[in-house]
Amino acid sequence: MLGSYGKAPSDADLKVAAAIECIHSYSLVHDDLPAMDGDLMRRGKPSVHAAYGEAEALLAGDALLNLSFSLLAECACYGGHYAHIMKLVADRCGAEGMIGGQALEFETDLRTADAARLTEIAGLKTGMLMEAAAVSGCIAAGREDEADLWREYAHKLGIAFQLRDDILDRGSGENSLAGVLGAGAEAELDGMIADIDEILLRTGGNSEFLRALTSAMLRRTTDEV
């Protein structure tokens, strides 16, 4: 993100990036727990709870979340926009964002959910974490005037990312956004990618790298990221 605006990341910027990655990792560790998705494998290896037990997995996730905010607090000590970024990340990954999306998923009968509900869940569970990353980069680059564009980009990217996951996982037998869309799922994804490209072209930075990265994410042939 910073590179697209021609800026090199500072040490504080790298800590923000590491903090967001810690949040992503903690969310995967907790999502894999038996009380959540119950997945035994993650990235081709046993998930944390499968390898070390549920208690260790719960504590590992908690530790990663605390580490993320320790890193963000270090950045906030610099003042300026880093305190704003810390609040942004907390909001997007909390009850009204990523965690709220997980809760909404548990409240939903996924066997009968329609496309609108599944899209809402994806926008919260995945899109909000992506928004935290994208808008943080925008703020760090000094281009907060483009924050709305990056929010739109992240929201659409989160939904498209989930749709690609669903397309790759069609054989699981679970209801999903791809399942609801049926034969039109690939065309819907193509339309989302076109929309995302158009948003990137409207930003003031060099969008070539981010367009290539987005395409790689949404054209991937594995659901492991």
Language-model features and meaning:
Residues 1-225:
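All-alpha prenyltransferase/terpene-synthase fold signal
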